[in-house]
């Protein structure tokens, strides 16, 4: 066992002395040491319950003959960090999560890991660490919250964001917004729709790194605690079997995850996180081209908020990710090994799809193509991403004049100041990994546009979007403006064309005009210090996952 490094031989007497002070008995030194990486915090609703799940994991580890050691890492709530400087730290925190899990596992020679994340950047950060460490690991995601109810309809947090714009447009009273605010999130856990946190939980299960049913098992259900306990038992078996993450997270497994992502119409942030996780494993090639290729083959089969009226609860009742995999079985790689020790085929052999109005059959999809599309052109030579499954049919192709802003904050002033007109293409630039720095999410602008009823306004940015964004919103434009990307050459009034079916994002400028404007472009100066200053120096481009270089 790897833990023998700290517990075997006369030279390890000091180590054993310290470990005994943690309560270990002589017998415990014969057992595998299992780390439980817990991202509990009481300021993040998606993580406030993880202490309880950690206890269930410990019960499982102990019952299977292991020794459980719990440690913590950080967690940021994107909803609370939204629309202020705090959002600059969100994507950057993914790297800190990965580094802290790696550091704890290596420093203490752990034999295996149970990873306990819930929200947006914590899930990929922990998976990056698992891939990097390559010791047996299993993930227990925290689970979605139940949907709220407002005036007889199901609602979630995105309805509150959009409600701000609706109030501004005079279509809702402040009292109604306050009522919506109180009932949209009926309890803690991850938001009720298919936003980034729940998308990443689904893809973790599709990768084979969580037990079947884990992603959609709601946090309030006893099933979630059972899965946590079973995961604790299973990790001890995985250590005995030497079943490592690189044996599970193969090229084919990542392709399965991308197919599930496209079928569900998941968050655009997956085009950052899936390549970033894969980058930790030698020999894998997971890039935007793969998303583009598969999006033309895999249909969008589940209309879940923000793209539709269904919630994660509906997906769970329809059979969850096992049912999605079953529906896609003619496309997916069924021989991939999973954390169960069995193949995908064995896991889904007896699965039945519960509600075909939630998980549609392949011959009757929501859309004929996958939920995400990769656009390229003279504005995005290295690519950009749009959640096409959440774009209205009449906005799949749009041409309009640019309204250019050098930050999210400038754009928000213009939106609420009534300076955005139907037909405009909003450009928010210098918000990329280096430009922000930190590649902030543009949920406030997109929600304000939707809430104010501006149905023919598009938005493009080198920043990101929340998984809750809907509409003709194109993000991750690469290269970013701060790195002399063409977005820096756009002026107010330039005609921009978005053609999602043709996968094009272009501005009506010649190559020479773009080059001349870039030479005279003045980049905003943004003074940052501490971690953000280091992140700005090291962050890579969005088209390769914005990983540190």
Swiss-Prot record:
Reactions performed catalytically: (2R)-2,3-dihydroxy-3-methylbutanoate = 3-methyl-2-oxobutanoate + H2O; (2R,3R)-2,3-dihydroxy-3-methylpentanoate = (S)-3-methyl-2-oxopentanoate + H2O
A biological-process GO annotation: isoleucine biosynthetic process
Cofactor: [2Fe-2S] cluster; Mg(2+)
Sites where the protein binds [2Fe-2S] cluster: 119, 191
UniProt superkingdom: Archaea
Pathway: Amino-acid biosynthesis; L-isoleucine biosynthesis; L-isoleucine from 2-oxobutanoate: step 3/4; Amino-acid biosynthesis; L-valine biosynthesis; L-valine from pyruvate: step 3/4
SUPFAM superfamilies in the record: IlvD/EDD N-terminal domain-like, LeuD/IlvD-like
Residues annotated for Mg(2+) binding in this entry: 78, 120-121, 441
GO molecular function terms listed in the Swiss-Prot or TrEMBL record: 2 iron, 2 sulfur cluster binding; dihydroxy-acid dehydratase activity; magnesium ion binding
Function: Functions in the biosynthesis of branched-chain amino acids. Catalyzes the dehydration of (2R,3R)-2,3-dihydroxy-3-methylpentanoate (2,3-dihydroxy-3-methylvalerate) into 2-oxo-3-methylpentanoate (2-oxo-3-methylvalerate) and of (2R)-2,3-dihydroxy-3-methylbutanoate (2,3-dihydroxyisovalerate) into 2-oxo-3-methylbutanoate (2-oxoisovalerate), the penultimate precursor to L-isoleucine and L-valine, respectively.
Subunit structure: Homodimer.
Name the record gives this protein: Dihydroxy-acid dehydratase
Organism per entry: Methanothermobacter thermautotrophicus (strain ATCC 29096 / DSM 1053 / JCM 10044 / NBRC 100330 / Delta H) (Methanobacterium thermoautotrophicum)
Gene name tied to this protein: ilvD
